[in-house]
């Protein structure tokens, strides 16, 4: 049979089948596990459909079908595979039954070919399933090996991780112990530092207290030194200078320099101190060369005594002895042996202070009186200056006023001499001016002094009266003048408003009158175009314009000068 099946599959078909498998973009895994179930469900479905379409006499029962299939239980292929049946690998039992019937039945070639084809398909399916099973077994074995390796590696990793955790715990415990020890050491160090800082602060406070007491005692000592006589102070200074022989050539020039600075106001003493400084320098040179400084020191001390007793007071002794570089190895000496001596000196100083206070009070009183006098004189001078400035301003204003009057009179004279006037017109103008002057005179002065005065005299009196009134206005308080000015301005504004209202009312009346006339008048009828010239000649009334301007200027001048 194998020889008969061999022509069905050639090498070309195998290559084609292999190429098709290679061209597939997917792989089928574990599909044959559910093949039996799918075939069984398909068979049931087809059987159900067939039974549904069959007649009643054509249908069979399950027992009859099982009886017809009972002979298949006697068949078994491949007993080495564990007695697996052939049903789940093949398309059905019909070809197998026909194959087992043997040569007893007569079959056609077509049936034989179909049987061979079915057999080949079964063998091919079996070989495919075996290969797949082998492949799956290899995969399972490989996966089991991988799982074992992974499990072993996981166990190793778990052991390493546990070891790492143990080491980490041990390190953390050691670190905590070290941190606790460091914290304890830090706290101990902090406590020691705090204790040391407290000790330093205590020492500093003690030093400050001691320095304060030392300053107080030095102040008292300097005070007592100031109260002591000058010759005793000089003796103590010389003793200190003689005690420090190694620094004698440094201290004495400093003392002499201080003496020269304090006595710079006295020229004769400066020259003597210069000689003593030279002597001290010569003494230092001789001491370096011969080693005999005692004679020169005594000579300079006598010179300093004689000069200090003549030139220095008690206020210079403190700065004379206050030198930072001087040594105070000697015990401090006091001039006052008994408290009564110090009290006596203090009483004398108190009396001197009282006399000085009295003298300063007298000087202050005299100074206050002098300041008061100076202030009064200054006020008088300022008032006189202000009065003179006011007089100056007044004179300037009068000058300006007179200049304006002169300009106005000059303008009037030009006005009277302007144009061609005849004598009658001048007489009429003079009469009108005299009448206006008389009216102004009556308003300003009155009717009592109107007898026998010409207009010029009346103008002089009116002018003098105006000057008096201007002076009186200047003497009136500024507040009253401002109040009167405000009243006048208010009256002017009220008058201007009234005039404006009257003008407005007049314009309204004129507009109303024009409107009434326009309403009453008969409407004009336009009878055609208005006839016009082709060219209109210019008007010949140009000569009237200057006359109108002259009349306007004359009217303005008369209104300005005579109203």
Curated annotation (Swiss-Prot):
Composition skew (Basic residues), residue ranges: 523-533
Region (Disordered): 521-550
Any coiled-coil regions, as ranges: 129-212, 384-415, 485-522
GO MF, one annotated term: ubiquitin-modified histone reader activity
Keyword Lyase: no
Compartment(s) where it occurs, according to its Swiss-Prot or TrEMBL record: Cytoplasm, Cytoskeleton, Microtubule organizing center, Centrosome; Cytoplasm, Perinuclear region; Cell projection, Cilium, Flagellum; Cytoplasm, Cytoskeleton
Superkingdom of the organism of origin: Eukaryota
Pfam families: DUF4200
Keywords, in A-Z order: Cell projection, Cilium, Coiled coil, Cytoplasm, Cytoskeleton, Differentiation, Flagellum, Spermatogenesis
GO biological process: acrosome assembly; sperm flagellum assembly
Gene Ontology CC: one annotated term: centrosome
Function of the molecule: Essential for male fertility. Required for sperm flagellum biogenesis. Also required for acrosome biogenesis. Required for the attachment of developing acrosomes to the nucleus during spermiogenesis and may be involved in the transport of fibrous sheath components.
Record note on quaternary structure: Interacts with CCDC42, CFAP53, IFT88 and ODF2. Interacts with CCDC146. Interacts with TEKT3. Interacts with ubiquitinated histone H2A.
Protein name: Coiled-coil domain-containing protein 38
Organism whose genome encodes this protein: Macaca fascicularis
Encoding gene, per UniProt annotation: CCDC38
